[in-house]
Amino acid sequence: MYSVAQNHALARVMHRSIHAAAAAALAVILAACGVQGSYTNTLPAATEVGDPRSIQGVRHVGEFADIEPVTTTPKPALPVELTDADGYEVVVEDTSRILALDLYGTYTKTLTGLGLAPNIIGRTVSSTETVLADLPVVTQGGHNINVEAVLDLRPSLVIVDHSIGPREAIDQIRAAGVPTVVMQPERTIASVAQDIEQLGAVVGLPQEAEKLAQRSVEEIERDMSAIKEIAPADPLRVIFLYARGNGGVFFIMGEGTGAKDLIEGVGAVDLASEHNLSYAEPANAEALAKLNPEAIIMMSGGLESTGGIEGLLQRPGIAQTIAGQNQRIITIPDGQSLAFGPLTGQTLIELAKALYAPDQA
C-alpha cells in the first residue's frame, strides 16, 4: 500500500465486488454504451451456443484496440509525495517523461487510459498499444531491465514493480537520481479499481483514475454477466500454460499468477487451483496427466515460441490430454492475458468467445 501526501489526497480505494447482473435472454449486446468507445462485443444467445467440448482446433484472441482515455488533456496535481512498496520515500514532481515497466503491460495501458500516452517514452515487450509501437523497448531477454537503455531516455519518472527486474537494475536506476516508484498491485479482477486508483495517485491524477476505475468495473460486471449466460452448466476444466521456447520454461500457472481469476472469470474451472498447485509448476507429463485439461490457455507468443500447435503437441504429455487430442488451445496476446488493468472486461469477453462461440470471435 502507498501513503500519498499531496494537496489532493490519495483517491479513495474502492473495493468493488464483481457480481453478476441480469443479462438479455436472447442476445447480449455488449456495447460500450458511450463509456469506453474502444470495443463493442456481441455474444450469441445461450440457445445458439453449442457444446464447447465439441469444438476443435486452435483459437486466437486478437490484439485489442488502444484504450479510450478518460481525458485528452490531463493536468497532474504535482508534486506527489509517497512511500513506495520498497519503503523508499519518493517525490514525483515531473510526469513529462514516464517509463512504466511491468511484466504484463498493465501500467502503460492504465496510463494511456488516464490520457498520459504522450508522456510515455519507452516500453517493455508487453506494452503492445498501437500508440506506443514506435517507442524503444528498454528490456532485454524478455523482461530484464536494460539500465543503460532506461537512463539514455532521461526519464523524469520510472514506475515499476518486481514482476520484472532484476532488483539490482531498479536499484541502479534509483541510484542514478531518477525518481523511481515501486508498485505492488494485486492484479485480480476484484482489485482492478484499486490498482488503477493507486497508479493514478502516483501521477497526480486521482479524479481521472476514479473515472477510469469506475468505467472498468462497469465493463467487467456487464461482460461477466453476459458470459454467465453462455457458459455451460458443466464448466470446462482448463489450465493456463506459460511457455517460452522448447527448453525448460514450460509451466502450469497456479496460485498468485492471476490464471485462476482469468479462468474462473469466464465460467470455467481452474484445475491448477483445484489441485492446489503453487505459483508455477513444471508442466511435465505426470502433472498434465493428473490434470487432464479439456482446454489450454496460453499467451500468443508462448505458443509461437514453442513451434505452434505442432511443437506444443511434441511436448511430453500434451497430446495425451483431452485438450491436446482436440487441439483445443486458446491464445491471448501476451500483453493482455494477465494484465488485469482497464481492459479486463474485454479480455474476459474475448476469451469467452474463443472458448464457447469461436464463430463470434
Q: What do these predicted regions represent?
A:
Residues 253-279, 331:
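His/Asp/Glu-enriched short active-site or ligand-binding loop at hydrolase and phosphoryl-transfer sites
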Residues 146-163, 178, 284-298:
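Proline-aspartate-enriched helix->loop->beta-strand connector
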Residues 195-198, 291, 295-361:
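Structured C-terminal subdomain patch of bacterial secreted/periplasmic proteins
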Residues 64, 97-151, 157-162, 271:
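A short, structured surface patch at a secondary-structure boundary
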Residues 166-169, 185-198, 232-258, 304-307:
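Extracytoplasmic ligand-binding site segments that recognize negatively charged/polar headgroups
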Residues 2-26, 31-104, 207-238, 357-361:
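Bacterial Sec-exported substrate-binding components of ABC uptake systems
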Residues 102, 162-163, 242, 299-303, ...:
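Short secondary-structure boundary segments
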Residues 138-147, 186, 276-284:
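Short helix-initiation/N-cap motifs at beta->coil->alpha
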